[in-house]
From Swiss-Prot:
Zn finger (RING-type) location: 24-65
GO cellular-component term (any): nuclear ubiquitin ligase complex
Domain text: The BRCT domains recognize and bind phosphorylated pSXXF motif on proteins. The interaction with the phosphorylated pSXXF motif of ABRAXAS1, recruits BRCA1 at DNA damage sites. The RING-type zinc finger domain interacts with BAP1.
Positions of crosslink type Glycyl lysine isopeptide (Lys-Gly) (interchain with G-Cter in SUMO2): 109, 298, 336, 440, 456, 512, 1048
Residue span of region Disordered: 165-198, 321-362, 492-581, 640-767, 864-899, 947-995, 1030-1056, 1147-1185, 1205-1230, 1244-1289, 1313-1343, 1437-1547
InterPro entries attached to this UniProt entry: BRCA1 (IPR011364), BRCA1-associated (IPR031099), BRCA1_serine_dom (IPR025994), BRCT_dom (IPR001357), BRCT_dom_sf (IPR036420), Znf_C3HC4_RING-type (IPR018957), Znf_RING (IPR001841), Znf_RING/FYVE/PHD (IPR013083)
The protein's name in its UniProt record: Breast cancer type 1 susceptibility protein homolog
Biased composition (Basic and acidic residues): 557-572, 669-679, 973-991, 1527-1538
Biased composition (Acidic residues): 1175-1185, 1313-1323
Domain of life: Eukaryota
Free-text tissue specificity from the UniProt record: In the embryo, expressed in otic vesicles at day 9.5. At day 10.5, this expression decreases and high levels are found in the neuroectoderm. At days 11-12.5, high levels in differentiating keratinocytes and whisker pad primordia. At days 14-17, expression also observed in kidney epithelial cells. In the adult, highest levels found in spleen, thymus, lymph nodes, epithelial organs, and alveolar and ductal epithelial cells of the mammary gland. Very low levels in brain, kidney, and skin. No expression in heart, liver or lung.
Biased composition (Polar residues): 321-332, 352-362, 538-556, 702-733, 758-767, 947-972, 1151-1166, 1255-1279, 1333-1343, 1492-1504
Residues with Phosphoserine modification: 114, 392, 686, 706, 717, 831, 971, 992, 1152, 1154, 1174, 1180, 1241, 1297, 1303, 1343, 1413, 1481, 1495
C-alpha cells in the first residue's frame, strides 16, 4: 500500500501541478476557452472579455501589465486541448485509484481488492481508458483473484513466482511511475492485459514493488511527462543491469528482468512483463548498448511503465484481461496454459544467458543487440501500456530459440496477455516473424500447434531473413497485423505520429502521452532518428546490415509499443486491447490489431495469417514478385485489411499509412475479414514478399495515405522504402488511432476532427503542395483535406513509378477499401497525414520522391486548393498504373498541373501526372474511359484501379464536403461511403453519355438519370467528380465532350458540397451535357465553383500547353478580378474551376467591350485554357463543343442572328440552371462570352456565360440547352426585349455600346461577384485555396491573351465606371417604374420583329430546349438565378428594358447584400432569367425583385414561351439550389443588367460566328434585348414568389472574420437572402459570432438589432444550414445572452416578442464623448426603443412630462466637473451609458439608481466592437 500510495501521490502531485499550470490567473480555475495575449499569457476568454469590458481605459495584462486589446487576443487551442486532456487524465486517475484528487489517498474497495497487486505494480498507474476502466475496475476484483490463481499456478509451474519475488526485491530501485494518459488506450490496454493478465499480474506482483521503488526513486521525474524520460533512462540502465544478472538466474531473475524491462518499457502488463522480461533479458545486453542511444526513450518508457497510474489501471486491465485471457484460453486452455508455461519457461530460458545467447545470436544475426534491446524495450513499454506486450516480447525472444515452443508460449501468453502486444513484441524481439506470426495465430485462435509449426517453418525463413534484420523487421511490421515484432518495428514511426498528434494536442493524444509518454517520447526521438535512419536502415537491411536494421527495428518497436497503447486507449474495453495492438503494429499492424481488438480471436487469426505472411514476406520483401502483387490484390479485394497488412509487410515504411487506412476500414468488417486477411497474408507472405509490389498495393489500398507512402516505397530502393516506411508508419499510426477511435466506438465526428487536426500536420510531408500548406495547423479541416488529397496524389506518383504495383494496389484498394469503410479510411488517412506531417525528415524525403514523380510544382502556389487536387491526384495514380502513363504523366503533369492549378489538379501536382497519363499513356486505357464518361474516369479508376478510384473519391469527397460544411470530415466520410455507389452510377451514366455524344437528347436524358442518381449520391459524386475532373483534364484532349463531362463531374463536387441537389444534377449534366447539357450541368454547379472545376478541366484539356505559361500571366492580369473569384472557387471543392470561370469571364468581358470580335477570338483561346482549368471549359476544344452547340442552335433557330441569340439564350439558360457560379462568371464573360461562346460556347457558356452575359444570356443559354422550347420562347421573348431595349436605349447600336459598357462593368462586377462567390465558397471550404486558384485561373487564361486580357481589363474598368453611371441613371428609372409591372411590356411589344424572330428560334430550340429545361429545372441553379436580391433585381430589371439589362437587374437584386453578391448579380440575373423562363415561379420571384414594372411584360412573354418548362424548373430552383448560384452578386452592379443584355448577343455571336461583330452588335443586341425582356418577364414572376420569400430575410453580420463573412455571403446567395452592411428597417437578422451556448459579445449591430426587434442569430445557423443544405429554423440558433449582461438573459427574444418600446416615455440627451460608439448610433438605439432623443441639452424640459435622462460615459470624460454641472443645469438624471446598453441587451429597463453617475465611480463597460 505504501508503495502504491506514494506513487499515486506522486501522480496526484503531478496532476495538481499541471492543474496549477493550466489554471486561469483571473478566475483561478482550469482554463476554459483559453486565449493568449501578445505577451503570451493565457486566460479564459470570458475572463479577459470581462476584464476588457470593465476597464475604462486601455486594459492591462493581469500578469505583466502590458496593454492588451480585444483584437490582440488569440484563441489557444493547444491550451484548451491540454486542459481537456488534463480533465480526462484526472478523471482517469480517479477511476484508476478510486480516490478524488482532492481527497488524499483513499482507495476504493475495488482498488483495495487489487491492493497487493497495486503495491507490486504501484509504479504503474494507467490513466488510460478511463471509460472502460469503470467496467474493468469491477472486473479487477474477481479478475485479480483469478489472475493470482492462474498466475500463481502458471508462474509456479514456470518458476516465475520465485523469480517474481526476487525481481520485486531487485526491481524496486528501478521502479518508475508510468502514467498512461490515453483514455482509450488505457481501456484497450486494460483489455489486452486481460489476455496477458495472468502473466502480467504475476509480473505486476513482481514488478509493482520494483516498479514502485523505481517510481519512488524517480517520483520527481514522474511528476512531469519529461520526468518519465529520465526515470526511464535510469530504469533502463537499472533494468539492463538487472537483466544482466537476471540472465544468470534465468528463472528467478526473469521476472525481475521482465519487470525492469516491463517497467522501463511500460510495466503495464505483468504477463507482458514476464514474457517481456525474458525477451528483454536476451535483449538486456543489447539494451545496455541501446540504452546509450535510446536511454532517453527507454527512460521515458520506463517512467511511464513505472508510473503508478499504469500499475493501477494495469491491474484493472489484467483483472479484466485475465477473464478475457481465461476465456480466450478456454478454447485451448491446456494448450495455451502449456504453451504459456512453456513460453514462460522459454522466456526464462531466454532470460538465461543461454537463451539470451541463442536468442540474441539469432537476434544479432537478424537484429543487433542494441537494436534488439531497444526494440524489446519499446515493445515491453508498449506491452506494459497495452498490458500484453511484455509477455509477447519474451515469448518472441524465446521463439527465436525454439519456434515451436515459442509459438505455443506466444499463443498462451498472447492469449493470456492479450496476445496482441505480446506477439508483436516477441516477434520484434525474435527476429523470426514466422514464429511470431504462428504464435500470434495460436494465441488468437488457440491454434498453438499450427502456430508452432508455422513459427518453426516461418521462423526458419524469418531467421533466414535475420541476415537482413531491418528488412525482416519491416516485413514483420508489414505483417505486423500478424507479427507483433513487425508492429513493434513500425511503432517508432507510430510514436512519431503520436508525437505529432500530441503536438495537435488531441485529448486522446494527450492521454496517450501519459499512458505511453515514455514509450512514445523516446520512440519519437528515436523515431526521428529512426525515420531518418530507417530508409538507410532499410537499405542496410537489404544489405544485411543487421545492427542498423535491428536498431531501427527496436526504435520501431518502441514506437509501436507506444502506438498500440494509444490505440488501446482509444478503443473501448475489448476493442481497446485490439486497438492498442493495432496502434503498436503501427500502420500495418494497426489494422490487424484493430481487428484483434474488435474480434480478438478473429483478429488473432488474422495476425496469424499476417504473421505467416510477414514471415515469408520478410525474406521475400527483398524479392518483389509481381505475381504476388496480383495475388495480394485479389486477397486485398477479399479483405482490404489483409491487403493493407500485406502491403505494409512488404513495404514497412511506405505502406504504414496504408495499413492504417485498411486497418481502420477493416475493423468494421473485422469478423468478415479476419480469416480472409489471414489467408491473404499467408499468400502474401509466401508469394507477395516483394516490398515494392506490396507497397504499391498497400499504398493503393490505403487509398489516401497508403498510396502516398507507396510512392516512395514502391520504388525498390531500400532507402526510399525505409523513408516511406517511417512516414507510412507515422501516418498509419495516426490513421490507426483515428480508425481505432472510430472503431472503438468513439464519436466518429470527434475522431474525425482529431484525426483531421493530426492529418493537417502529417499531410504536409505527404504532398508537394500540401506539405507546405498542411504545415499550418490553423485550417485543420482544410489542411486535412488538402493533405488527404496530397497523400492521394503522392500515392499516385508512387503508382506512376511502379505502374504495375500501382495497378494491383488500386484494384485491391478499390474492391477492399472502397467497400470497407470509406469514412473510417478517410479518418485514418487524416491521421496518417497528420503523422506524416510530423515526420519532417521523412516528409522531406517523401516530398522529394513526390516531386521526382511530378516535376511540375507550380501548384505550390495553391496549396490549399490542392487538397481537392490531391484527391484528384489520387484518381490520377490509378491512371498512371502503366509505366508509359507515368512518363507521360510526368511530362503532361506540368501542363496538366498548371491547368489543374485552378481546377484542383494542383493538388494533383503529383496527380497531375494523372491527367497527362490519362491523356497520353492512360488516355488509351483510362483516359478514354474518362473521356467517354466524364464521370466514368472515376468509375474507370474504380473498375480498372479500384483502390485509387476509391481513394480519389474519398479525398475529393472530403474536399467537397469540407467546403460544403463546417464539419467537412464527417461529410467527406459520408461522401466516401456514397461515392462508390455514385461512381458506379456515374460510370454507367458517363458511358451512356459518351455514347450519346452524338445525340444530345440522349445525353440530356442520361443527364436526367444521372441527375437523379447523383442527387442521391451528390456528395459521392462531388468527390469523384473532382477526381474525374483531374483525369478528364488530362484524358479528354481529343474529346471535348469528354472534357465537358469531366468538368461537369468537377462541377458536381462543388455543387454537391454546396448543395446535394445541385451536385447531383451537375454530375449527370457533366456526363450528358456534351455541349449544351454539360454547360447546363456546369451552370448548375457554377455557383459552387463546379464551374471552376469545369473550367480547369477544360483548360487542362485544351489549354495544357499554354496553361503552364498562362497560369502566372493570367493571375497577374486578372489578379484583382480573379482574386475574388479565387475565393469563391476555393470555397468550393472545385475552387479552381469557379475561380477560372470568374477569371475567364472577367477577361472576356474586358476584351469584349470594345473589340468584341477580336476579344471573342482571343477570349476563346483564353477560355479554352480556362476551360482546362475549369470544368465548364473542359470542352477545351471549344470548336468541337461549339459545333455541337451550333448544331443545337441550328436546330433551335433558322436565322443566324436569331440562332446566335437563341444560342446565347440557350446557353444562358443552362448556365443559370447551373447556378450562381455561372452568374459571377457571366458578368465577366459579357465580352468574353462571345469568345467563349464561340470556342467553348457550350461549356463555357454553360459555366461562364450564365454569369458572364447577365441574366439574359444565361437564360438564353439555358433555354437552348435546358429546353429548346424554352429557348424558343426565350428567343421570341428575346426579340421583344431587344426591341424594347433598342427603344429604351434609342437604338441597337447605342444599346450595344451600352451593353459593352455594361459588359465591361459587369466584368468588373463579375470580378466582385466572383470574389464574393469565391470568398464565400472558400469560407466554407477553404478561402486560402481559392485565392491561389484564382491566380492560377488568371494565369492560365492569360497564357494566350495576357496582353489582351490586360487591355480588356483596362477597358472593362473604364466601361465599368461608365456602366455604373448609366446604371445609376437606370436605377433611378427603374425605381420610378418599380411600381409599374408593365414597364417593360411596351418595349417588349414594341419589338414585334424580335418576337417573330424568337418564335423562329423557339421551334428550332424546342427539342433541345425542352430537354435542357428539364435538366435545368432539375438543376437548382435556376432557382439560384432567381434568388438575386429582389430590390436590386427590380431596379435592374426596370433598368434592363432600357439598357438591355433588365434581366440582369432582376438577377442582381442583391447589391444590398454585398459587393460580392452584387457582382454575381448580373450573372445571377441571367441565371435567374433562365430559371424564370424555366419556371414561372422564379419569374414571379424576380418580378418583386425590382424589375416588376419593366419586366412584367417580358415576364408574360417569357412565361408564355417557357411557362411549363420554367414551372418545372422553378420548383427545383425554388428548392434552394439557387443558394449555390451567385444571385446576390448580380444585384450588386446595376450596370450589369445592360451588360447581360449585351452578353447574350455577344455570346450568340461567339458561338456561331466569332467574327460577326456587326451582327452581334445589331441582331445580337436585339436578341439580347429580347432575351432581357423575356428574362425580365420571367424574372418578375419568380421574384414575386420565391424571391419575395427570400426577401423576408435581410441579414447583417457582426463580429465575424472575413472568411465567415464570405461564408455568410455565399449562404445568402444560395438561399436568395439579402445581405447588407448596415442595419436598416428592412433588416431581419443579425448574424453574430457566438459560443456553443449561443452567447455572444456585445457589438453595435447587436444592440441595434435588439433595439429594432431583429433576429439575433448565431453564425452557427449559417454553418449548420450550409452543412445540412437547407435553411434551418432560426429559433434554434437565436442568441441567448452576452458575455457582459448575462449568458441567458433572452434579451433578443424578448425584444422580438415585445410590443412595447423599452424606453418609451423617456426624453434622452446623449452627452458626448462616447469612446466605442458614435453618438448618432446611440441615439438611434434609443429612438428604436421608443425614447425621445433631443439633440441639444437645453431641449430637455419637463413640459413634455417625460422622464429626463442624460446619458454620459464618465470614463471618456477628461473633466469630471462637467457631470454635476449638466445634472444641475438640466435637473435630469445623469446616467451612465451602461444603463442603456445593459437594459437594451436584456431588453429590460435596469434600475437607474444603480447607474447614476452621482452614485457610481465612473467605471463603465464599453460595448465591444461597436463599429462592427
Amino acid at each position: 500500500m505504501d508503495l502504491s500510495a506514494v506513487q499515486i501521490q506522486e501522480v496526484q502531485n503531478v496532476l495538481h501541478a499541471m492543474q496549477k499550470i493550466l489554471e486561469c490567473p483571473i478566475c483561478l480555475e482550469l482554463i476554459k476557452e483559453p486565449v493568449s495575449t501578445k505577451c503570451d499569457h493565457i486566460f479564459c476568454k470570458f475572463c479577459m472579455l470581462k476584464l476588457l469590458n470593465q476597464k475604462k481605459g486601455p486594459s492591462q495584462c493581469p500578469l505583466c501589465k502590458n496593454e492588451i486589446t480585444k483584437r490582440s487576443l488569440q484563441g489557444s487551442t493547444r491550451f484548451s486541448q491540454l486542459a481537456e486532456e488534463l480533465l480526462r487524465i484526472m478523471a482517469a486517475f480517479e477511476l484508476d485509484t478510486g480516490m478524488q484528487l482532492t481527497n488524499g489517498f483513499s482507495f476504493s474497495k475495488k482498488r483495495n481488492n487489487s491492493c497487493e497487486r497495486l503495491n507490486e505494480e504501484a509504479s504503474i498507474i494507467q490513466s488510460v481508458g478511463y471509460r472502460n476502466r469503470v467496467r474493468r475496475l469491477p472486473q479487477v476484483e474477481p479478475g485479480n483473484a483469478t489472475l493470482k490463481d492462474s498466475l500463481g499456478v502458471q508462474l509456479s509451474n514456470l518458476g516465475i513466482v520465485r523469480s517474481v519475488k526476487k525481481n520485486r526485491q531487485t526491481q524496486p530501485r528501478k521502479k518508475s511511475v508510468y502514467i498512461e494518459l490515453d483514455s482509450d488506450s488505457s481501456e484497450e490496454t486494460v483489455t489486452k492485459p486481460g489476455d496477458c493478465s495472468v502473466r502480467d499480474q504475476e509480473l505486476l506482483q513482481t514488478a509493482p514493488q520494483e516498479a514502485g521503488d523505481e517510481g519512488k526513486l524517480h517520483s520527481a521525474e514522474e511528476a512531469a511527462c519529461e520526468f518519465s524520460e529520465g526515470i526511464r533512462n535510469i530504469e533502463h540502465h537499472q533494468c539492463s543491469d538487472d537483466l544482466n544478472p537476471t540472465e544468470n538466474h534465468a528463472t528467478e531473475r526473469h521476472p525481475e528482468k521482465c519487470q525492469s524491462i516491463s517497467i522501463s518499457n511500460v510495466c503495464v502488463e505483468p504477463c507482458g512483463t514476464d514474457a517481456h522480461a525474458s525477451s528483454l533479458q536476451p535483449e538486456t545486453s543489447s539494451l545496455l548498448l541501446i540504452e546509450d542511444r535510446m536511454n532517453a526513450e527507454k527512460a521515458e518508457f520506463c517512467n511511464k511503465s513505472k508510473q503508478p497510474g499504469i500499475a493501477v489501471s494495469q491491474q484493472s486491465r489484467w483483472a479484466a484481461s485475465k477473464g478475457t485471457c481465461n476465456d480466450r484460453q478456454v478454447p485451448s486452455t491446456g494448450e495455451k496454459v502449456g504453451p504459456n508455461a512453456d513460453s514462460l519457461s522459454d522466456r526464462e530460458k531466454w532470460t538465461h544467458p543461454q537463451s539470451l545467447c541463442p536468442e540474441n545470436s539469432g537476434a544479432t544475426t537478424d537484429v543487433p543487440w542494441i537494436t534488439l534491446n531497444s526494440s524489446v524495450q519499446k515493445v515491453n513499454e508498449w506491452f506494459s501500456r497495452t498490458g500484453e506486450m511484455l509477455t509477447s516480447d519474451s515469448a518472441s525472444a524465446r521463439r527465436h530459440e525454439s519456434n515451436a515452443e515459442a509459438a505455443v508460449v506466444l499463443e498462451v501468453s498472447n492469449e493470456v496477455d492479450g496476445g496482441f502486444s505480446s506477439s508483436r513484441k516477441t516477434d520484434l524481439v525474435t527476429p523470426d516473424p514466422h514464429h511470431t506470426l504462428m504464435c500470434k495465430s495460436g494465441r488468437d485462435f488457440s491454434k498453438p500447434v499450427e502456430d508452432n509449426i508455422s513459427d518453426k517453418i516461418f521462423g526458419k525463413s524469418y531467421q533466414r531473413k535475420g541476415s537482413r534484420p531491418h528488412l525482416n523487421h519491416v516485413t514483420e511490421i508489414i505483417g505486423t497485423f500478424i507479427t507483433e515484432p513487425q508492429i513493434t518495428q513500425e511503432q517508432p514511426f507510430t510514436n512519431k505520429l503520436k508525437r505529432k498528434r500530441s503536438t495537435s494536442l488531441q485529448p486522446e493524444d494527450f492521454i496517450k502521452k501519459a499512458d505511453s509518454a515514455g514509450v512514445q517520447r523516446t520512440p519519437d526521438n528515436i523515431n526521428q532518428g529512426t525515420d531518418l535512419m530507417e530508409p538507410n536502415e532499410q537499405a542496410v537491411s537489404t544489405t544485411s546490415n543487421c545492427q542498423e536494421n535491428k536498431i531501427a527495428g527496436s526504435n520501431l518497436q518502441k514506437e509501436k509499443s507506444a502506438h498500440p497503447t494509444e490505440s488501446l486507449r482509444k478503443e473501448p474495453a475489448s476493442t481497446a486491447g485490439a486497438k492498442s495492438i493495432s496502434n503498436s503494429v503501427s500502420d500495418l499492424e494497426v489494422e490487424l490489431n484493430v481487428h484483434s481488438s474488435k474480434a480478438p480471436k478473429k483478429n488473432r487469426l488474422r495476425r496469424k495469417s499476417s504473421i505467416r505472411c510477414a514471415l515469408p514476406l520478410e525474406p521475400i520483401s527483398r524479392n518483389p514478385s509481381p505475381p504476388t502483387c496480383a495475388e495480394l490484390q485479389i486477397d486485398s479485394c477479399g479483405s482490404s485489411e489483409e491487403t493493407k497488412k500485406n502491403h505494409s509487410n512488404q513495404q514497412p515504411a511506405g505502406h504504414l499509412r496504408e495499413p492504417q487506412l485498411i486497418e481502420d476500414t477493416e475493423p468494421a468488417a473485422d469478423a468478415k475479414k479476419n480469416e480472409p486477411n489471414e489467408h491473404i497474408r499467408k499468400r502474401r507472405a509466401s508469394d507477395a514478399f516483394p516490398e515494392e509490389k506490396l507497397m504499391n498495393k498497400a499504398g493503393l489500398l490505403t487509398s489516401c495515405s497508403s498510396p502516398r507512402k507507396s510512392q516512395g516505397p514502391v520504388n525498390p530502393s531500400p532507402q526510399r522504402t525505409g523513408t516511406e516506411q517511417l512516414e507510412t508508419r507515422q501516418m498509419s499510426d495516426s490513421a490507426k488511432e483515428l480508425g481505432d477511435r472510430v472503431l472503438g466506438g468513439e464519436p466518429s465526428g470527434k475522431t474525425t476532427d482529431r484525426s483531421e487536426e493530426s492529418t493537417s500536420v502529417s499531410l504536409v510531408s505527404d504532398t508537394d503542395y500540401d506539405t507546405q500548406n498542411s504545415v499550418s495547423v490553423l485550417d485543420a479541416h482544410t489542411v486535412r483535406y488538402a493533405r488527404t488529397g496530397s497523400a492521394q496524389c503522392m500515392t499516385q506518383f508512387v503508382a506512376s513509378e511502379n505502374p504495375k504495383e500501382l495497378v494491383h494496389g488500386s484494384n485491391n484498394a478499390g474492391s477492399g477499401t472502397e467497400g470497407l469503410k470509406p469514412p473510417l479510411r478517410h479518418a485514418l488517412n487524416l491521421s496518417q497525414e497528420k503523422v506524416e506531417m510530423e515526420d519532417s525528415e521523412l516528409d522531406t524525403q517523401y516530398l522529394q520522391n513526390t516531386f521526382q514523380v511530378s516535376k511540375r510544382q507550380s501548384f505550390a502556389l495553391f496549396s490549399k486548393p490542392r487538397s481537392p487536387q490531391k484527391d484528384c491526384a489520387h484518381s490520377v495514380p490509378s491512371k498512371e498504373l502503366s509505366p508509359k502513363v507515368t512518363a507521360k504523366g510526368k511530362q503532361k503533369e506540368r501542363q496538366g498541373q498548371e491547368e489543374f492549378e485552378i481546377s484542383h489538379v494542383q493538388a494533383v501536382a503529383a496527380t497531375v501526372g494523372l491527367p497527362v497519363p490519362c491523356q497520353e499513356g492512360k488516355l488509351a486505357a483510362d483516359t478514354m474511359c474518362d473521356r467517354g464518361c466524364r464521370l466514368c474516369p472515376s468509375s474507370h479508376y474504380r473498375s480498372g484501379e479500384n483502390g485509387l478510384s476509391a481513394t480519389g473519391k474519398s479525398g475529393i469527397s472530403q474536399n467537397s464536403h469540407f467546403k460544403q460544411s463546417v464539419s467537412p470530415i464527417r461529410s467527406s466520410i459520408k461522401t466516401d461511403n456514397r461515392k462508390p455507389l455514385t461512381e458506379g452510377r456515374f460510370e454507367r451514366h458517363t458511358s451512356s453519355t459518351e455514347m450519346a455524344v452524338g445525340n444530345e437528347n440522349i445525353l440530356q436524358s442520361t443527364v436526367h438519370t444521372v441527375s437523379l442518381n447523383n442527387r442521391g449520391n451528390a456528395c459521392q459524386e462531388a468527390g469523384s467528380g473532382s477526381i474525374h475532373e483531374v483525369c478528364s483534364t488530362g484524358d479528354s484532349f481529343p474529346g471535348q465532350l469528354g472534357r465537358n463531362r469531366g468538368p461537369k463531374v468537377n462541377t458536381v463536387p462543388p455543387l454537391d458540397s454546396m448543395q446535394p441537389g445541385v451536385c447531383q444534377q451537375s454530375v449527370p449534366v457533366s456526363d450528358k451535357y456534351l455541349e449544351i447539357k454539360k454547360q447546363e450541368g456546369e451552370a448548375v454547379c457554377a455557383d459552387f465553383s463546379p464551374c471552376l472545376f469545369s473550367d480547369h478541366l477544360e483548360q487542362s484539356m485544351s489549354g495544357k500547353v499554354f496553361q503552364v505559361c498562362s497560369e502566372t500571366p493570367d493571375d497577374l492580369l486578372d489578379d484583382v478580378e480573379i482574386q475574388g473569384h479565387t475565393s469563391f472557387g476555393e470555397g468550393d471543392i472545385m475552387e479552381r474551376s469557379a475561380v477560372f470561370n470568374g477569371s475567364i469571364l472577367r477577361r472576356e468581358s474586358s476584351r469584349s467591350p470594345s473589340p468584341v470580335t477580336h476579344a471573342s477570338k482571343s477570349q476563346s483561346l483564353h477560355r479554352a485554357s480556362r476551360k482546362l482549368e475549369s470544368s465548364e471549359e473542359s470542352d477545351s476544344t471549344e470548336d468541337e463543343d461549339l459545333p455541337c452547340f451550333q448544331h443545337l442552335l441550328s436546330r433551335i433557330s433558322n436565322t443566324p442572328e436569331l440562332t446566335r441569340c437563341s444560342s446565347a439564350v440557350t446557353q444562358r439558360m443552362p448556365e443559370k440552371a447551373e447556378g450562381t457560379q455561372a452568374p459571377w462568371k457571366g458578368s465577366s464573360s459579357d465580352c468574353n462570352n462571345e469568345v467563349i461562346m464561340i470556342e467553348a460556347s457550350q461549356e463555357h457558356q454553360f459555366s461562364e456565360d450564365p454569369r458572364c452575359s447577365g441574366s439574359m444570356f444565361s437564360s438564353q443559354h439555358s433555354a437552348a440547352q435546358g429546353s429548346t422550347a424554352n429557348a424558343n420562347s426565350q428567343d421570341s421573348n428575346f426579340i421583344p426585349p431587344s426591341k424594347q431595349r433598342s427603344h429604351q436605349c434609342g437604338n441597337e447600336e447605342a444599346f450595344l455600346s451600352d451593353k459593352e459598357l455594361i459588359s465591361d462593368n459587369e466584368e468588373m462586377a463579375t470580378c466582385l461577384e466572383e470574389d464574393n462567390d469565391q470568398e464565400e465558397d472558400s469560407i466554407i471550404p477553404d478561402s486560402e485555396a481559392s485565392g491561389y486558384e484564382s491566380e492560377t485561373n488568371l494565369s492560365e487564361d492569360c497564357s494566350q491573351s495576357d496582353i489582351l486580357t490586360t487591355q480588356q481589363r483596362a477597358t472593362m474598368k473604364y466601361n465599368l465606371i461608365k456602366l455604373q453611371q448609366e446604371m445609376a441613371h437606370l436605377e433611378a428609372v427603374l425605381e420610378q417604374r418599380g411600381n409599374q409591372p408593365s414597364g417593360h411590356s411596351p418595349s417588349l411589344l414594341a419589338d414585334p420583329c424580335a418576337l417573330e424572330d424568337l418564335p423562329d428560334l423557339e421551334p428550332n430550340m424546342s427539342g433541345a430546349a425542352i430537354l435542357t429545361s428539364k435538366n435545368i429545372n432539375e438543376n437548382p441553379v435556376s432557382q439560384n438565378l432567381k434568388s438575386a436580391c429582389d430590390d436590386k433585381f427590380q431596379l435592374q430589371h426596370l433598368e434592363g428594358p432600357t439598357s438591355g439589362d433588365d434581366e440582369s437587374g432582376m438577377g442582381r437584386p442583391s447589391p444590398f447584400k454585398s459587393p460580392l453578391a452584387g457582382s454575381r448579380g448580373s450573372a445571377h440575373g441571367c441565371s435567374r432569367h433562365l430559371q424564370k423562363r424555366n419556371s414561372p415561379s422564379q419569374e414571379e420571384l424576380l418580378q418583386p425583385a425590382g424589375s416588376e414594372a419593366s419586366s412584367e411584360p417580358h415576364n408574360s412573354t417569357g412565361q408564355s414561351c417557357l411557362p411549363r418548362r420554367e414551372l418545372e424548373g422553378t420548383p427545383y430552383l425554388g428548392s434552394g439550389i439557387s443558394l449555390f448560384s451567385s444571385r446576390d452578386p448580380e444585384s450588386e452592379s446595376p450596370k450589369e443588367p445592360a451588360h447581360i443584355g449585351t452578353t447574350p448577343a455577344s455570346t450568340s455571336a461567339l458561338k456561331i460566328p466569332q467574327g460577326q461583330v456587326a451582327f452581334r452588335s445589331a441582331a445580337a443586341a436585339g436578341a439580347d434585348k429580347a432575351v432581357v425582356g423575356i428574362v425580365s418577364k420571367i424574372k418578375p414572376e419568380l421574384t414575386s414568389s420565391e424571391e419575395r420569400a427570400d426577401r423576408d430575410i435581410s441579414m447583417v453580420v457582426s463580429g465575424l472574420t472575413p472568411k465567415e463573412v464570405m461564408t455568410v455571403q455565399k449562404f445568402a446567395e444560395k438561399y436568395r437572402l439579402t445581405l447588407t452592411d448596415a442595419i436598416t428597417e428592412e433588416t431581419t437578422h443579425v448574424i453574430i459570432k457566438t459560443d456553443a451556448e449561443f452567447v455572444c459579445e456585445r457589438t453595435l449591430k447587436y444592440f441595434l438589432g435588439i433595439a429594432g426587434g431583429k433576429w439575433i442569430v448565431s453564425y452557427s445557423w449559417v454553418v449548420r444550414s450550409i452543412q445540412e443544405r437547407r435553411l434551418l429554423n432560426v429559433h434554434e440558433f437565436e442568441v441567448k445572452g452576452d458575455v457582459v449582461t448575462g449568458r441567458n438573459h433572452q434579451g433578443p427574444r424578448r425584444s422580438r416578442e415585445s410590443r412595447e418600446k423599452l424606453f418609451k416615455g423617456l426624453q434622452v440627451y446623449c452627452c458626448e464623448p462616447f469612446t466605442n460608439m458614435p453618438k448618432d448610433e446611440l441615439e438611434r438605439m434609443l429612438q428604436l426603443c421608443g425614447a425621445s432623443v433631443v439633440k441639444e441639452l437645453p431641449s430637455l424640459t419637463h413640459d413634455t412630462g417625460a422622464h429626463l435622462v442624460v446619458i454620459v460615459q464618465p470614463s471618456a470624460w477628461t473633466e469630471d466637473s462637467n457631470c454635476p454641472d449638466i445634472g444641475q443645469l438640466c435637473k435630469a438624471r445623469l446616467v451612465m451609458w451602461d444603463w442603456v446598453l445593459d437594459s437594451l441587451s436584456s431588453y429590460r429597463c435596469r434600475d437607474l439608481d444603480a447607474y447614476l453617475v452621482q452614485n457610481i465611480t465612473c467605471d463603465s463597460s464599453e460595448p465591444q466592437d461597436s463599429n462592427d
